[in-house]
């Protein structure tokens, strides 16, 4: 599902809200989540999951085109850990 598909679905389900209001709400929420992660904050949404940063240490990689070894710096990457309710809901759908 893309961001625009999410906005479409929410706008249809919440017909009392204007499409532009739903669009602004989704974009604002995603911007705040992104900003919180960028500043190193952990985000926890009970029942859904948590977002945090994990550090990937520096390593030696290889350029697949030339075969040359390349030194890659360490970096932080976003990490999502699903909550118990989300895991159970996903598993229930796939166990049928």
UniProtKB/Swiss-Prot annotation:
Record InterPro entries: Hist_DNA-bd (IPR000119), Histone-like_DNA-bd_CS (IPR020816), IHF-like_DNA-bd_dom_sf (IPR010992), IHF_beta (IPR005685)
Keyword DNA-binding: yes
One cellular component term from this protein's GO annotations in UniProt: chromosome
Pfam families assigned: Bac_DNA_binding
Annotated spans, Disordered: 59-78
Annotated GO MF terms: DNA binding; structural constituent of chromatin
Gene Ontology BP annotations: DNA recombination; regulation of DNA-templated transcription; regulation of translation
Ranges in coiled-coil conformation: none
PROSITE patterns: HISTONE_LIKE (PS00045)
Superkingdom classification of source: Bacteria
Keywords: DNA recombination, DNA-binding, Transcription, Transcription regulation, Translation regulation
Transmembrane stretches, start-end: none
Summary of the function given for this chain in its UniProt record: This protein is one of the two subunits of integration host factor, a specific DNA-binding protein that functions in genetic recombination as well as in transcriptional and translational control.
Matching NCBIfam families: hip, PRK00199.1
Subunit details: Heterodimer of an alpha and a beta chain.
Family to which the UniProt record says this protein belongs: Belongs to the bacterial histone-like protein family.
Name by which UniProt lists this protein: Integration host factor subunit beta
Taxonomic classification: Bacteria, Pseudomonadati, Pseudomonadota, Gammaproteobacteria, Chromatiales
Name of the encoding gene: ihfB
